[in-house]
């Protein structure tokens, strides 16, 4: 074909490639007709319309038209480009329909057609259709010319008559055809101003009742493609009504057509498909005759059985025109009986009014009605059963249909029916067809007969159907049991990411809305129905009713979809997906919390045994990771922890108040490490605004890994302490001390030989005990553990709180707080004393002088238990020292008697070697005065002697301790308080050597006080407190200088020596920058002090006091 203008236009709005137009004068052969293009007329989505002039027949013998074209006649050429065989078949269908309607009145006439493959190298076909030309364009153009004046009633009747007559030609065929796309745009106006029906591309035969989901899906897609939304009938929109799509659908479209002729808009323009389903519309104020209005009313009846047939429509129009009906009554029903419709409508409206009144009464009476009124209400639902019965599934088709296409649940159906009820109540003033009463009648049965609903089962649904026919994008919602199994596995992993099962743990598959898909931008059928979720009880509400239309039918009706075009919404997903990230996240947290509680309850019943070392190691690693970052000690903001039950954002309290404070028990802190790890992963970081302990990053602290491990050990130690007996506690303390000594021996190879082995044995035993959940609980710990005031409280908390993995961290947290009164007020001082007495047997001299006995012993036990759970013995030793210091805080009366103080001193020396000694030794500033009196009681120290300590004494751990303690001038229990004051003052002063904020220093002093070795306390504090000194020497200097200069930093009263002694100690501190020198002096003094005159031991600090 020659192209002269060179212009090209897009063939369709769907993005098809541009196609060149025919130019005027172009010759085209259509079948046996040769035509010449006169001009381009219009273009549609797939077609181009030309005005052509008939030239000649290519074959006279092929001319079979009843009214043949004459040469020179003008015709219309429709050029359609189709992409595939499907498009070609549709065009073939249109041609066939037009051939059948050739010669019929008010139908656009067909002349000829031709189909061929495209010649421009593009895949597809070109279809040419030659037909009658209507020069006055379409009815839409005709109406657009009358926008201001509107159409007169005569014009409307004329148009309706012509269109109804054309439709009758289709309905009266031997096999009735339905146009399915009757609308203003498809009516053309010929040269004589007659109105003719065109565009038969959507025409089809009547559709049988479809009952299977697959058939419904296919028909839904077909309807969507070939019909116009505003003209669709209710049975087209809701195929689950199982109503036939036949000539009555054309009658509905014709009623919308008439409404638009009157009011230039469709009745459902502003309301949508649900208004169509219930035929809810209104008439604007108008001056049209009631005959036209009534005709609209009966044609727009929701019940297709109440709509007139085409003969009755024509009869009514002819009655208005006062002409004879041009067709005979094929249906033999005569004229439409308006009285019948009025009677039906009045009855329906009366029932609706009564139902409305009963519903209002029910609401006023708190949803209660008498039995008679309830039965009446149900009967009214039945009596308002307006639409033809919803046919259940065929027995043969139902099983297969259900197995491959699920239905929605009854709950959704009931909600729909309630909506229809409200629509019915509101429809008493409308003249349109009765509202959808089938669902109303059914709702009465389903709502009031739940047993029937439960007994009716879907014939084809099996459990496996839930998993079948799931498309890749389909979501699966497991059952609760599956979720439990999944959570049990995930609990070990402690994954912080909510899974799908966790997002919707309580959802049944039947409660999920039907998922909708689309195979194309305009398709709504196909296999999408297979992807919908299965309902456990897919029951048609009609089956629950004893309605005569459904009685005796054992098949099941799947509930209809609210969305008549389920395949359109590609991105449509379950409504549950939006709320999963938030609510299910907390479901997950709650479930995990419950499992933690269960695990704790189990541990509590089993004697509060601790997890295996491997598990504990993993937890310690988590704690270490947490502790690598600066953070508040352990009293994090409670809102950061989900699993805790008794958490409060209160600052750490003194031991005296904490002892009985169950509200501040360590419920939350036991699980801090894990919680913090998971919270940090999920974006929740613990608050660093710890109320009592300022967070400081240690500049010069022990190895962070060790410190972290020590903290973790402390946390666990306290936890284990809550469950053990005093004897076991004492043993644990002794073992911790041994561990401390062993560490010092490892560091100081000179003295460590036998002592290390002894300590190693004890540490292993302690670790076993700790794993067995036997580490003793010292009442003194209550002072340090505001969250665990007593073992009783701990037992309760175990049930309520998550697993107690952070006992070490608890003690650490507690020690950070100032506890001036806590030492004396600690509830468990008596028990601590007993333990301390045992230690005094071994370390009477050192402990009495240092006043660390009780605190150190308690901390030693706790830290030892924590260390026992950890893999490293050194960590255990360090933790033992720290833990002992904690316990010493609880009862300062017995400080002088415990080995812990000596051990703590050893630890301090080790730390000094590391640059930490000066920092970690802060001995009890508070103890200074209190401990003097307490230490003065040698009898107390003797009381503290125990079996365990006696065994320790045989080992003579003194040698390792002597290095550190002899300089402290630790004396026998009979030492004068003056010596004690001296010893105590430097220790707390050294404790203050940390240049930390007043609160931090206070916490540090207490921590050091609590920890015998002071290392543990300093380490734990070191995590949270910054040592501002820049070097080891600097630490030593600052320790001793600030121990005296900055005693005010500590909330604990410090017993200081005379000013001259303080000056001398400062001088010594300056001279002690060389730690090696100090160590050598300590070693030298250890030998002399062990057998020194007066039977006194010389402590590390004695180096600074020697020159008085």
UniProtKB/Swiss-Prot annotation:
Its EC number is 2.7.11.1. Residues 493-513, 781-791, 810-819, 935-976 have a biased composition (Polar residues). The modification Phosphothreonine is found at residue 471. It catalyses: L-seryl-[protein] + ATP = O-phospho-L-seryl-[protein] + ADP + H(+); L-threonyl-[protein] + ATP = O-phospho-L-threonyl-[protein] + ADP + H(+). Keywords: Acetylation, ATP-binding, Isopeptide bond, Kinase, Nucleotide-binding, Phosphoprotein, Serine/threonine-protein kinase, Transferase, Ubl conjugation. The modification Phosphoserine is found at residues 10, 407, 504, 541, 574, 801, 846, 953, 960, 1048, 1072. Residues 35-319 form the Protein kinase domain. The active site is at 181 (proton acceptor). The modification N-acetylserine is found at residue 2. ATP binds at residues 41-49, 70. Residues 405-466, 493-534, 590-663, 765-791, 807-838, 858-1108 are annotated as: Disordered. Residues 436-449, 514-534, 590-629, 859-872, 1049-1060 have a biased composition (Low complexity). One of its GO terms (cellular component) is cell periphery. There is a cross-link at residues 1008, 1046 (Glycyl lysine isopeptide (Lys-Gly) (interchain with G-Cter in ubiquitin)). Pfam families: Pkinase (PF00069). Residues 419-435, 910-934, 1006-1048, 1071-1082 have a biased composition (Basic and acidic residues). Gene3D superfamilies: Transferase(Phosphotransferase) domain 1. One of its GO terms (molecular function) is protein serine/threonine kinase activity. Transmembrane segments: none annotated. Present with 3000 molecules/cell in log phase SD medium. Belongs to the protein kinase superfamily. Ser/Thr protein kinase family. This is Serine/threonine-protein kinase AKL1. It comes from Saccharomyces cerevisiae (strain ATCC 204508 / S288c) (Baker's yeast). The gene is AKL1.
